[in-house]
Amino acid sequence: MSVEIFTKEQQARGSFNNGEILEYKPIGFPQDGGFLKPYSNLFYWAHAWTPGEKSTIGLHPHQGFEICSFVLKGKINHFDTKQNKWIPLSEGDVQVIRSGNGISHAEEIDAESEIFQIWFDPNLSVSLKEDATYNDYKSDDFTINDFSGGTIKTILGVDSPMKIKTENILINCYSLDGGTHSINLKNGMVHSFFILSGEINFNHNIYDLGTFFKINDLEKFKFNIDKEMKLFEIISPKNPSYKTYANMR
């Protein structure tokens, strides 16, 4: 059994444009100094927001990785050298940049907006030989199902339109009512959870917004909450079938 918990204070930090964009990074770059390093086929995970006015990160290149942006609040605008135009995205929307053999993009985060940017490793020995592609998906494209105690939004999984090449990835977002909860965990997989709002009582400790959980070799994730909360989940293989970039270093 393995449950690792990383509060905001244990995560790497970042910023752009003199603090116009701020970040906590559950999984940072090697030079960022956070406690958690890349694992599974997850290479990077940043929670970024604008505390005030909108701000733009200028054109910059990417290769190999699949870069997914999830709009948690507000709006963003995206530009890349394949689309050659600005594309707006709103709360609940998702974009996928399969950066392949190279693409450059710019991103504008609107005032008081918030995103995840997560890099997946699709097997760089293959992806670096492929052309870059782009897709975005609207919030209404994703299925929301009710269950006892809340709802689950399937972002990547059965019946989801979202597609990535990185193997065996599932992504969900839970909206949970107050009470006791138990989430079934998959054998051979790593479940990564991020508290989007509210608090969790786990093993007699309280964890709040921004806390990150990495869990594997456990049948169920059991916890209590006093009131409504939101929980973001990525399920990924404990041992990918290929050597990841992080394992090559």
Language-model segments: residues:
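"Short basic amphipathic alpha-helical interaction patches in structured regions
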Residues: 82-90, 109-110, 130-136
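Conserved, well-structured core segments that form or line functional sites
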Residues: 103, 112-205, 209-211
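Conserved short histidine dyad/triad with adjacent acidic residue
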Residues: 4-34, 42-62, 72-79, 86-87, ...
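Ligand-binding loop in jelly-roll beta-barrel domains
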Residues: 99-126, 206-208, 215-246
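Short acidic-glycine-tyrosine-enriched beta hairpin
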Residues: 80-98, 186, 201-225
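Glycine- and charge-enriched low-complexity intrinsically disordered segments
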Residues: 129-133, 244-249
